[in-house]
């Protein structure tokens, strides 16, 4: 098991070595905007560290905690979640408002579902600045 902070405190990911599977809890998102509104700069780093721990297990399949039910369980969603968080952090520094951050992220990730999660995340990030 991997315990860490992601979109909430005390997220747990379960590793089943016999079938090379990770059930990622809230650590990995699959084609959904991650809910970053419950975290901050330190939390982003903890989330990225959790993704590193999950990736180090070298699973063949990862069941994401959030995403459309018809999506695959490809481990590439670990890296996609990591890149999303890093992009969000970078654009948070490069933009001047929640709306600008939201719009820039939507341009980069137009096919992800739940834009309300992105909007809440952008508002929280800019309120902390």
Specify the residue positions occupied by each region the protein language model found.
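A charged, solvent-exposed segment within the mature domains of Sec-exported extracytoplasmic proteins
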Residues: 1-4, 98
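Metallo-beta-lactamase
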Residues: 3-79, 87, 91
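Accessory terminal helices/loops
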Residues: 56-61, 69-129
């Amino acid at each position: 098991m991997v315990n860490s902070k992601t979109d909430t405190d005390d997220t747990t990911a379960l590793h089943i070595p016999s079938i090379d599977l990770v059930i990622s809890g809230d650590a990995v998102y699959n084609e959904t905007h991650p809910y970053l509104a419950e975290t901050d700069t330190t939390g982003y780093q903890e989330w990225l560290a959790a993704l590193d721990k999950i990736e180090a297990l070298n699973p063949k399949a990862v069941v994401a905690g959030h995403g459309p039910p018809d999506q695959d369980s490809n481990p590439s969603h670990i890296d996609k979640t990591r890149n999303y968080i890093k992009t969000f952090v970078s654009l948070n520094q490069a933009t001047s408002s929640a709306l600008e951050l939201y719009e820039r992220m939507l341009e980069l990730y137009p096919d992800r579902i739940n834009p309300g999660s992105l909007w809440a995340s952008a508002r929280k990030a800019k309120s902390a600045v």
